[in-house]
């Protein structure tokens, strides 16, 4: 046998190394090291990217969320009970996508877009990424078209525009979902497509919402995305992004859409659970450091986009049309504490908030909208002209009434002006009450506001204000149908409409005693 000296040995090793193709070795396969609480640790997968889909045996998928030096932390989408240590895991090279398009309207789907309503498969023609970058500043347009919620208190004092993010915030069981559902019901003839995302709710509650939408003819215009309380934290975390992608389909094609997130507090809790299981360091209230980004990247996707954006997106197929996605996120507070971590985050991200107060709700004022701390930062420019003109004194009357009511408890005798202000405030408060599932048209709303603004309620008993309003609206829709139709179509306020409303109310009061 030939003897090799050390220099020859090193030369042979160098040649062998040069000939071997290390780069061609597979780096996109790994081994499951541990499985617990829906979190999988995988050794290997050197080429995996953040947010990439990982495939396990048996058609189970996960999503890579933690990329560490020698392992990957992934969250399993769906049932993880079939996964065991030692199983193989593969990179797919794809990010999570959900079906989009008009085929989803009228259906109930889970966070991955699979139908769960028993009505058969959905033959969607397209899919789109769940996580997308929001449109840039250059592609956006200012909010100047209204979204009518059908609630007097909201449309008059806290108007919502197309492309706005308006937060609905309040304690549990106070009417937050009811307000959002009524806003969806009111869009059935407006051309605005709706998406309702239920996060961490009871399945009975979701079924009730779907039934109510169907009863009022609004389900055919709505996509319901449901990640109920029994679903994994991963699906509750992903559901809002999936719903947003489905809504963006309409926005990007020059249509208008409305999305309700019910509610983002539960999404934050699900994300906190995932982050703690992934051993990320906890911060305030044990939430991870990026919980603000969790909501900001979601809510920034709601926007009004320009004609150029729509034209560029559709390759010239749609021209001269703007698109919008309006968001109504819901946040649940604990004992009215709006200064907690998640509520303050979402208040700072959104363009205003509708604050519902439990004291008002318990006093029978429903919707329990607190006009004092509720605000719409951009909706004023989008408000219908007639409603804007007639609602100017409503917020002031309510604010003054609340201040005087507190003061009047201590004062024994009040002067005439103060007494009149108090009585006017009581009547306006009564007028702002509205039943659930009874959204109002612009004309009906304008008539109520006109009666309050011009002092026609002054001689009506406080207890009879609601009945007076209903009788007045019924009278106008019967006797002055043309005027009401004109207000609904145009939404303008001029001397002719002013005179018509005045003459009609005077005729009503002359023929009926209140």
From Swiss-Prot:
InterPro entries recorded: ATP_synth_asu-like_sf (IPR023366), ATP_synth_asu_C (IPR000793), ATP_synth_asu_C_sf (IPR038376), ATP_synth_F1_a_nt-bd_dom (IPR033732), ATP_synth_F1_asu (IPR005294), ATPase_a/bsu_AS (IPR020003), ATPase_F1/V1/A1_a/bsu_N (IPR004100), ATPase_F1/V1/A1_a/bsu_N_sf (IPR036121)
Site (Required for activity): 374
Gene Ontology cellular-component annotations: plasma membrane; proton-transporting ATP synthase complex
Mode of membrane association: Peripheral membrane protein
Residues where ATP binds: 170-177
Keywords assigned by UniProt, alphabetized: ATP synthesis, ATP-binding, Cell inner membrane, Cell membrane, CF(1), Hydrogen ion transport, Ion transport, Membrane, Nucleotide-binding, Translocase, Transport
Enzyme type, top EC level: translocase
Subcellular location: Cell inner membrane
CDD domains: ATP-synt_F1_alpha_C (cd18113), ATP-synt_F1_alpha_N (cd18116), F1-ATPase_alpha_CD (cd01132)
Catalytic activity: ATP + H2O + 4 H(+)(in) = ADP + phosphate + 5 H(+)(out)
Listed EC numbers: 7.1.2.2
GO terms of molecular function: ADP binding; ATP binding; proton-transporting ATP synthase activity, rotational mechanism
Main location: membrane
PANTHER family, sorted: ATP SYNTHASE SUBUNIT ALPHA, MITOCHONDRIAL
Subunit annotation: F-type ATPases have 2 components, CF(1) - the catalytic core - and CF(0) - the membrane proton channel. CF(1) has five subunits: alpha(3), beta(3), gamma(1), delta(1), epsilon(1). CF(0) has three main subunits: a(1), b(2) and c(9-12). The alpha and beta chains form an alternating ring which encloses part of the gamma chain. CF(1) is attached to CF(0) by a central stalk formed by the gamma and epsilon chains, while a peripheral stalk is formed by the delta and b chains.
Its job: Produces ATP from ADP in the presence of a proton gradient across the membrane. The alpha chain is a regulatory subunit.
Family: Belongs to the ATPase alpha/beta chains family.
Full protein name: ATP synthase subunit alpha
Protein species of origin: Stutzerimonas stutzeri (strain A1501) (Pseudomonas stutzeri)
Phylogenetic classification of the source organism: Bacteria, Pseudomonadati, Pseudomonadota, Gammaproteobacteria, Pseudomonadales
Gene from which the chain derives: atpA
């Amino acid at each position: 046998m030939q003897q090799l000296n050390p220099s020859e040995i090193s030369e042979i090793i160098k040649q062998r190394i040069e000939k071997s193709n290390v780069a061609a070795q597979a780096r996109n396969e790994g081994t499951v090291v541990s499985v617990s609480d829906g979190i999988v640790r995988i050794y290997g997968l050197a080429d995996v990217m953040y947010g990439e889909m990982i495939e396990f045996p048996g058609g189970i998928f996960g999503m890579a969320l933690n990329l560490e030096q020698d392992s990957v932390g992934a969250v399993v989408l769906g049932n993880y009970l079939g996964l065991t240590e030692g199983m193989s895991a593969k990179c797919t090279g794809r990010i999570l996508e959900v079906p989009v398009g008009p085929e989803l309207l009228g259906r109930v789907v889970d966070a991955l877009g699979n139908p769960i309503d028993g009505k058969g498969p959905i033959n969607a023609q397209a899919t789109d990424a769940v996580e997308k970058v929001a449109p840039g500043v250059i592609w956006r347009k200012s909010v100047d078209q209204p979204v009518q919620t059908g609630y007097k208190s909201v449309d008059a004092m806290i108007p919502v525009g197309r492309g706005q993010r308006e937060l609905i915030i309040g304690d549990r069981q106070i009417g937050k979902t009811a307000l959002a559902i009524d806003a969806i019901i009111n869009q059935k003839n407006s051309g605005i497509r709706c998406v309702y995302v239920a996060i961490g709710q009871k399945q009975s509650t979701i079924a009730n919402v779907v039934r109510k939408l169907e009863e009022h003819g609004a389900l055919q215009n709505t996509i319901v995305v449901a990640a109920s309380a029994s679903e994994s934290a991963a699906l509750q975390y992903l559901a809002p992004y999936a719903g947003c992608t489905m809504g963006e389909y309409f926005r990007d094609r020059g249509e208008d859409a409305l999305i309700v997130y019910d509610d983002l507090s539960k999404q934050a809790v699900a994300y906190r659970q995932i982050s703690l299981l992934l051993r990320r360091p906890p911060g305030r209230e044990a939430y991870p450091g990026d919980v603000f980004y969790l909501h900001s990247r979601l809510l920034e996707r709601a926007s009004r986009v320009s004609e150029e954006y729509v034209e560029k997106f559709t390759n010239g197929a749609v021209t001269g049309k703007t698109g919008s996605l309006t968001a109504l996120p819901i946040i649940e507070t604990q004992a009215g504490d709006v200064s907690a971590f998640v509520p303050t985050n979402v208040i700072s991200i959104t363009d205003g908030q509708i604050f519902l107060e439990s004291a008002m709700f318990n006093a029978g004022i429903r919707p329990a909208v607190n006009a004092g701390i509720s605000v719409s930062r951009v909706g004023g420019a989008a408000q219908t002209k007639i409603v804007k003109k007639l609602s100017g004194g409503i917020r002031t009357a309510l604010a003054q009434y609340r201040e005087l009511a507190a003061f009047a408890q201590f004062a024994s005798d009040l002067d005439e002006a103060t007494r009149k202000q108090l009585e006017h405030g009581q009547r306006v408060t009564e007028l702002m009450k509205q039943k659930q599932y009874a959204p109002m048209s612009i004309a009906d709303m304008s008539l109520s506001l006109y009666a309050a603004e011009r002092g026609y309620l002054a001689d009506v008993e406080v207890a009879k204000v609601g009945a007076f309003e209903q009788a007045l609206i019924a009278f106008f829709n019967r006797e002055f149908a043309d005027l009401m139709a004109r207000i609904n179509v145009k939404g303008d306020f001029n001397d002719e409409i002013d005179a018509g409303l005045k003459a009609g109310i005077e005729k009503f009061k002359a023929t009926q005693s209140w």
